[in-house]
Swiss-Prot record:
Gene: Mcpt8
Localization terms from the record: Secreted; Cytoplasmic granule
Identification of the protein by name: Mast cell protease 8
Alphabetized InterPro entries for the sequence: Peptidase_S1_PA (IPR009003), Peptidase_S1_PA_chymotrypsin (IPR043504), Peptidase_S1A (IPR001314), Trypsin_dom (IPR001254), TRYPSIN_HIS (IPR018114), TRYPSIN_SER (IPR033116)
Top EC category: hydrolase
Catalytic residues (positions): H64 (charge relay system), D107 (charge relay system), S200 (charge relay system)
A GO term, aspect molecular function: serine-type endopeptidase activity
Amino acid sequence: MFLLLVLLVAALPVNAEGGEIIWGTESKPHSRPYMAYIRFNDSKSVYRCGGFLVARDIVMTAAHCNGKVINVTLGIHNLKKKKNTQLIPVSEAIPHESFDNETLVNDIMLLKLERKAQLNSAVDTIALPKSKDWVKPGQVCTVAGWGKLANCTLSDTLQEVNLEVQKGQKCRSMSQTYNDSIQLCVGNPSENKATGKGDSGGPFVCNGVVQGIVSCRLCTGTLPRVFTRISSFMPWIRKTMKLLQQP
């Protein structure tokens, strides 16, 4: 999940599912009740992503976390302790219509759950931003997710880390497709902490409002990272949520 850069990355196997939880800390159990653990599969394998509950029956995640079968677990902290958690299949997945699977531009998706989540102290929704909300360079916000430890074993517990928003030109120098109007440039290279592949789809939370989606499929040791800027997609989000919630 949270990556100590370059040397440790080189030690990971090519098919590693996530980064390493280095410089991150274990979250207080159920302190982030909006977190969703997502498992999905295609014809070849089963994968994991993060996500977050935005309505009782809708989870937001990255569009590249799509598969033939998707299941969401809510209210979970330790993946080995499923008691009192809610496992809900996804009935419909709607990725953004302009999502590019190669560049990961417009990497946002809404999942309709087969049934509404039961809200409690461990399961709750998170606030979405307004369209005009603009996360600025220098802001420090938090990412949470489940990923691999430094020894390449899977983390059983939810981990979190604080990351600093960077100026867009830092990401433009690394990616020709970076677009500051719809993406966020996240992670201070001098701090050597970041997100990895296993954190895809997870929330970037600033002052209790989700402002970004981890949009990193094959993360290398280079910082900063590119996240989806949620505020830019609010018209699409409102329209799609209304569509998914029709009787």
